[in-house]
Amino acid sequence: MDEYTKIEKIGEGTYGVVYKGRHKATGQVVAMKKIRLENEEEGVPSTAIREISLLKELQHPNIVCLLDVLMQDSRLYLIFEFLSMDLKKYLDSIPSGQYIDTMLVKSYLYQILQGIVFCHSRRVLHRDLKPQNLLIDNKGVIKLADFGLARAFGIPVRVYTHEVVTLWYRASEVLLGSVRYSTPVDVWSVGTIFAEIATKKPLFHGDSEIDQLFRIFRSLGTPNNEVWPEVESLQDYKNTFPKWKGGSLSSNVKNIDEDGLDLLSKMLVYDPAKRISARKAMLHPYFDDLDKSSLPANQIRN
């Protein structure tokens, strides 16, 4: 830790305090995440350290780079590249009645998908995507933070500050207690974030697991075995759930054109086996008029 100086506390993440810091030798500004683990006494589990070490290899222009993993007094510090703004703060800063330019919405979504395809192709899930862990710079680049941390540390029910971890972006199969979930959980989260980037409002903002499910059901219809084989056998599925018909997404989601709504509906398909993959989503006609050559992952690297 002697290599870094803490400059200031910049926030509280899912796992602990985040500081802005500086690498003493190079002057590089970094984000330092102090990981606070459930059972402090036992120190950092070796499995977590193994998982985290693998994440240093996830190098992509749309993934926040993990630069270093340090231990100090049985505390784990993760050193990441520094970006000053997250998507949530950015959306909150847009004046009432104004929205993100439609081309930037498209560009952000495409870049998010590029980062996700990269991680999914390396069998790394995120599991906890939300606007707070999408970081942006002032050049139109968006990067995904905290990839792979859920597997290393689990997702706590409450942040260490006792704030409840948000359910708004959580896939229907996770909310219904499925234990065999995979890459489609991230695609669902991206769908909900897509709607929020366009409208500045969370698509499904429940304040408990059941409220979250019912908000989804009211919008998309209550799922059954017909639309999603096996849903009725998931551990948190109840036959007593009200049977909503579901309306159309377009009534909830303004500012997204027809192609965008088509893509959104494919990302929010209940059955994970039928939900569009991140790779397929990138090929959707919604992105036909996006200039992809200028995106960071498409720059020809020397």
UniProtKB/Swiss-Prot annotation:
For this protein, what post-translational modification is recorded in UniProt?
Phosphorylation at Tyr-15 by wee1 and wee2 inhibits the protein kinase activity and acts negative regulator of entry into mitosis (G2 to M transition).
Species of origin: Xenopus laevis
Locate the Protein kinase domain: which residues? 4-287
Catalytic residues? 128 (proton acceptor)
Phosphotyrosine modification sites are 15
Give the record's GO CC terms.
cytosol; nucleus
Q: Where are the transmembrane segments?
A: none
User: Per its UniProt record, what PROSITE patterns does this chain match?
Assistant: PROTEIN_KINASE_ATP, PROTEIN_KINASE_DOM, PROTEIN_KINASE_ST
* Quaternary assembly: Forms a stable but non-covalent complex with a regulatory subunit and with a cyclin. Interacts with spdya.
EC number(s) per UniProt? Answer: 2.7.11.22, 2.7.11.23
Please list the residues that carry the modification Phosphothreonine: 14, 161
User: Can you tell me which family this protein belongs to?
Assistant: Belongs to the protein kinase superfamily. CMGC Ser/Thr protein kinase family. CDC2/CDKX subfamily.
Q: Which GO terms describe its molecular function?
A: ATP binding; cyclin-dependent protein serine/threonine kinase activity; protein serine kinase activity; protein serine/threonine kinase activity; RNA polymerase II CTD heptapeptide repeat kinase activity
Q: What are its GO biological-process terms?
A: cell division; G2/M transition of mitotic cell cycle; mitotic G2 DNA damage checkpoint signaling; regulation of circadian rhythm
Protein name, per record:
Cyclin-dependent kinase 1-B
What this protein is reported to do is described as:
Plays a key role in the control of the eukaryotic cell cycle by modulating the centrosome cycle as well as mitotic onset; promotes G2-M transition via association with multiple interphase cyclins. During G2 and early mitosis, CDC25A/B/C-mediated dephosphorylation activates CDK1/cyclin complexes which phosphorylate several substrates that trigger at least centrosome separation, Golgi dynamics, nuclear envelope breakdown and chromosome condensation.
Q: Which reaction does it catalyse?
A: L-seryl-[protein] + ATP = O-phospho-L-seryl-[protein] + ADP + H(+); L-threonyl-[protein] + ATP = O-phospho-L-threonyl-[protein] + ADP + H(+); [DNA-directed RNA polymerase] + ATP = phospho-[DNA-directed RNA polymerase] + ADP + H(+)
Q: Which compartments does it reside in?
A: Nucleus
Report the main location listed first in the record.
Answer: nucleus
**Record InterPro entries:** CDK, Kinase-like_dom_sf, Prot_kinase_dom, Protein_kinase_ATP_BS, Ser/Thr_kinase_AS
Chain positions with Phosphoserine modification: 277
